[in-house]
Regions:
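N-terminal Rossmann NAD(P)H-binding glycine-rich loop of SDR-like oxidoreductase domains
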Residues: 10, 14-19
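Substrate-binding pocket helix/loop in short-chain dehydrogenase/reductase
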Residues: 86-89, 93-98
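The beta1-alpha1 cofactor-binding region of Rossmann-like NAD(H)/NADP(H)-dependent oxidoreductases
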Residues: 49-60
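Conserved glycine-rich Rossmann-like NAD(P)H-binding loop of the short-chain dehydrogenase/reductase
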Residues: 24-39
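Conserved NAD(P)H cofactor-binding loop of Rossmann-fold oxidoreductase domains
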Residues: 78-85
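Active-site loop of short-chain dehydrogenase/reductase
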Residues: 71-72, 119-123
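Hydrophobic positions on the long internal alpha-helix
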Residues: 111-115, 119
């Protein structure tokens, strides 16, 4: 079976991906912001702290993953953030927009770059 890394695996789609893949026998490495708040546990799932908005957190996550497995078959960059409200132009907070952009756009780039050597395997 394959080794999958899923970011944002503590709830929603990320958690459901993890559950479905675990049921098929895959190994999951879950990146979550708050591992202590994780309600779901499974013997084939390794959970590490990960804040995709933080380069330091991503580097630590990558080191933890590298200490657990020699390669990754699939990376699912699922972690994301949204404000959750519709706003007029006058109401949009530029700082919040930068944070959302950082998490949703730069975050997956950080994670992909940090885990790239493991995704390459023996290639």
């Amino acid at each position: 079976m394959a080794t999958w890394v899923i970011t944002g695996a503590n709830r929603g789609l990320g958690l459901e991906f993890a559950k479905q893949l675990l049921a098929e026998g895959h190994t999951i490495i879950a990146g979550v912001r708050n591992p202590e708040a994780m309600d779901f546990h499974h013997e084939q799932m390794i959970v590490y702290q990960l804040d995709v908005a933080s380069t330091t957190s991503v580097e630590t996550f990558a080191k933890n993953v590298k200490s657990s497995v020699s390669s990754i078959d699939v990376l699912v960059n699922n972690a994301g953030r949204m404000d959750g409200r519709w706003q007029s132009l006058e109401e949009v907070d530029p700082e919040l927009s930068l944070d959302v952009l950082n998490v949703n756009t730069i975050g997956p780039l950080r994670v992909s770059q940090a885990l790239w050597p493991l995704l390459q395997g023996d290639k």
